[in-house]
């Protein structure tokens, strides 16, 4: 009868809802991130990087082993290399042109130097590890253990100095790209603010940063070719280092928050990590990756196939990158500061590469971000006069053919 049918229907409906909930909970509880191998693609012509980032994050904190802008140095790292020049906070994944490598820090021991041939260090892959949201390495020359993790807008460094002595942290704003404008503002002995405006593939890129140390650091020296006024330094050549006597095994922690808009934006974004618990941030990054990777569940007894699949999925989620501050402010195509209302603003639209495969995938597994991407396209059209072709840091690079943003919108 009708009553029995309705009762059965409601029972089945409740069962299916419960099953869907349990399936979702089970998928999210699984460790998909363990299958990710960030070293896949870092050799040959893969042009990927192994460093720490979260899905679609503003920060990609990774070692730089190539600084010459070469074809196989597009990501800043190549597996064949054995020298690390430093750890910078922005990197491109899988592109055919070099850029980024912004806000580079390098820990050293002994007499400091501004020469990257001197402050760089050899390293061994035997002492290097990477997983989703985490990277670590030992710097042979200085015997410093480096561990890196990140939130969306903040890079988190942990340096362990295995020898007692004079420890330094080098800040090199001339790292990789041409420096158009650099500034360093000393706030106090644990905080500095930085602007790096550079030119490479993106012809006018702005990166503001707030750098915080967990212990007081002595501002030891600066190299500048322009203005030096008290605690403010600027120029098109700008490097600085900060020093401290350390005991054997002592750790120094550094947080670097980024903003495309202002010093105030970088300070606001620093609130993503209000503490100095490295392990907590590392775990949170891993959780974010598991949440995103759980959108596609693949089972296999072949661990290599799982590594290939989930690393490929991981690589699709390393970009586009969020390009707005926590309050929604972003730098538009007109180089003015705007506020995103009702959507999130993104950058790095390699549309010639991504319109066929990546964007259809986003449409299936991430409808919210797909809407954000399209709204970003529309704002760039309003501010710059056309939809993006190959957009980078709110700059149109005009790279490759076609007008593939139309296909993504359609």
What positions do the PLM features span?
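Accessory carbohydrate-recognition regions in carbohydrate-active enzymes
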Residues: 30-359, 363-410
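Bacterial Sec-dependent N-terminal signal peptides
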Residues: 1-30
């Amino acid at each position: 009868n009708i009553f029995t049918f309705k009762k059965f229907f409601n029972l089945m409906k409740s069962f299916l809802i419960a099953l869907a909930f349990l399936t979702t909970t089970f998928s999210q509880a699984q460790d998909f991130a363990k299958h990710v191998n960030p070293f896949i693609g870092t050799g040959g012509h893969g042009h990927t990087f192994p460093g720490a980032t979260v899905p679609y994050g503003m920060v990609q904190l990774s070692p730089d082993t190539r600084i010459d802008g070469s074809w196989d140095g597009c990501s800043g790292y190549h597996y064949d290399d054995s020298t690390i020049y430093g750890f910078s906070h922005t990197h491109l994944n899988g592109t055919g042109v070099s850029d980024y490598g912004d806000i580079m820090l390098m820990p050293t021991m002994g007499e400091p130097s501004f020469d990257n041939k001197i402050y760089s260090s050899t390293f061994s892959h035997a002492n290097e590890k990477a997983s989703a949201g985490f990277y670590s390495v030992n710097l042979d020359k200085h015997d410093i253990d480096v561990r890196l993790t990140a939130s969306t807008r903040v890079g988190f460094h942990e340096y362990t100095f295995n020898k007692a002595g004079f420890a330094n942290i080098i800040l090199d704003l001339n790292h990789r790209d041409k420096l158009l404008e650099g500034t360093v503002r000393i706030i106090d002995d644990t905080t500095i603010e930085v602007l790096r405006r550079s030119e490479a593939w993106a012809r006018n890129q702005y990166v503001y940063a707030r750098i915080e140390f967990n212990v007081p650091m002595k501002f030891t020296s600066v190299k500048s070719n322009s203005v030096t006024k008290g605690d403010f330094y600027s120029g098109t050549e700008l490097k600085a280092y900060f020093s401290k006597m350390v005991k054997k095994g002592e750790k120094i922690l550094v947080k670097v928050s980024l903003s495309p808009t202002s010093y105030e934006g970088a300070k606001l974004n620093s609130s993503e990590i209000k503490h100095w618990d490295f392990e907590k941030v590392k775990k949170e990054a891993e959780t974010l990756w598991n949440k995103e990777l759980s959108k596609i569940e693949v089972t296999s007894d072949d661990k290599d196939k799982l590594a290939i699949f989930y690393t490929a999925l991981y690589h699709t989620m390393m970009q586009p990158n969020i390009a707005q501050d926590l309050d929604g402010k972003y730098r538009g195509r007109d180089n003015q500061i705007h506020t995103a209302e009702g959507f999130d603003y993104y950058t790095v639209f390699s549309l010639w590469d991504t319109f066929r495969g990546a964007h259809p995938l986003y449409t299936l597994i991430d409808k919210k971000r797909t809407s954000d991407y399209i709204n970003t396209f529309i704002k760039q059209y309003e501010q710059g006069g056309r939809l993006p072709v190959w957009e980078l840091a709110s700059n149109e690079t005009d790279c490759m053919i076609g007008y593939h943003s139309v296909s993504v919108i359609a």
